[in-house]
Amino acid sequence: MLYHETFDVIVVGGGHAGTEAALAAARTGQRTLLLTHNIDTLGQMSCNPAIGGIGKGHLVKEVDAMGGLMAQAIDHAGIQFRTLNASKGPAVRATRAQADRALYKAYVRNVLENTPNLTLFQQAVDDVIVEHDHIRGVVTQMGLKFHAKAVVLTVGTFLGGKIHIGLENYAGGRAGDPPSIALAHRLRELPFRVDRLKTGTPPRIDANSVDFSVLEAQHGDNPTPVFSFMGKREHHPRQIPCYITHTNERTHDVIRANLDRSPMYAGIIEGIGPRYCPSIEDKVMRFADKDSHQIFIEPEGLTTTELYPNGISTSLPFDVQVQIVRSMKGFENAHIVRPGYAIEYDFFDPRDLKQTYETKYIHGLFFAGQINGTTGYEEAAAQGLMAGLNASLYSQDKEGWSPRRDQAYMGVLIDDLSTMGTKEPYRMFTSRAEYRLLLREDNADLRLTEKARELGLVDDARWARFNQKIDNMAKERQRLQETWMNPNSVGVEQLNTLLKTPMSREASGEDLLRRPEMTYELLTTLPAFAPALEDAEAAEQVEIQVKYDGYIQRQQDEIEKSLRHEHTKLPAELDYKQVKGLSNEVVLKLNAAKPETIGIASRISGITPAAISILLVHLKKHGMLKKGEAA
């Protein structure tokens, strides 16, 4: 049976990738349908109740800068906010917030239900409609057909999902939800490379059964950092602490004694787990020299007693989980509310994706989130936003867009995935970006909001706020450049108390701000440079831009050099066997990857600078180089 309405974009799955994808497509004016197996789980935090962290917070800020939802949702649901790496340079500072799961989910659903151009419908999808390598729509569990020009699959861990607790296992998409078996079988019929990954989650604990008096409390920052560029502290709910406990030798003995009952160590789980979020049994075996591991006790919300013990993700049997939990200080009488488990699921090799998240083999079909081999809410949200945007552009017969590596962590993410692929769940870190001094949390809007406005993602309120900030920054920098002091100026005594060496020659406000010991806050206490900007974000940008000017300029020069051939197109039909001088290995890799540009080709493992030079000569010889792209 065909549904009575056609759509431009269909999004399958209502997690962190799906919600951002649906909102992006709808914001750009396309009739969008979001299909989910259960409307009550839209925006659900399936694992840890937190958003952000090193690399991840950067992605959240970028999603926000492009009009996305995640940062605003956590600003309305965050019950503890912290700035990580606060004592380090601005490039690696990152925001992280604990979330009230219920508040987060409610905020997401409210936005979805009130977004123009967006229709929600509760039905699992069992099939995709493909004709002549083009997507035409989807078929739901009850045989209902929906037609659209573009389809975005954001199916999380549901494809062929299998839940493991000890040596027992059963089909499931996550605890309490059915897997997507029919769709998994259907997708395996399509010409994609598919494999298995696994992830896990710890048992949840009843706070009423924990002795907090013996635990170390960990409080958030005061004043609390704000995630969204449109956010305010007044949006934050009541703030509460987290707690810290540790595993001990007794814990480790319990784990070692029961390894034969672990599905991972018994060889039942084939999928590879996340390297940077290992299970407790993995930690004990991999770091055998450690007699203790720190465990963060994270509240799941203001109106629940459930606790999330971050650091003891496990798939060991339930009786062993009880022993592990009760071996830790403060948890001697702990009651487990939900058992921990591992989940194994299908993912598709992201090297089969274009940089727009469109699949190379089925036109109009886009993948985002864990289906691409990533882990984490933030990575999912970033992919969802870009896939939704590009599905919208595709449905309008417009050229797709994705940021470069030097423009955004979102650019690093898709470039890493589509050129190198992944064998384990991929997590974002600041260390993955070559140009991280330019890719800071604080300047995500300066990097992306203007482009997002051009693409139709940014509303008038955000655009007005952005332009006000730009204006404030420009005026303040001009003021500091034009305001001078010399050793004889009024107020120089006060200035000298702030400097390591007394002032010996005339200097502008910007000259003084470049000094390591000087901050914008200190500088504007001096009468000559008062008053400070009321716009705290603009003030922060002024300080960073002035202090790091030389380093920033150096990175921009490097980028300009590397960009010379970044976007030089490689014809899709090019047979690399016909390119004289390429080794057999290079030919095989290029024919398998079919890179869209010289830049992408250069980042494929095993493709040498010499091979790139040969390609450029070939393109020039056949008149395929544009003016200014000389080989």
From Swiss-Prot:
The keyword Flavoprotein applies. GO terms for cellular component: cytosol. NAD(+) binds at residues 273-287. Keywords: Cytoplasm, FAD, Flavoprotein, NAD, tRNA processing. GO terms for molecular function: flavin adenine dinucleotide binding. PANTHER family: GLUCOSE INHIBITED DIVISION PROTEIN A (PTHR11806), PROTEIN MTO1 HOMOLOG, MITOCHONDRIAL (PTHR11806:SF0). This is tRNA uridine 5-carboxymethylaminomethyl modification enzyme MnmG. It comes from Vibrio cholerae serotype O1 (strain ATCC 39315 / El Tor Inaba N16961). The gene is mnmG.
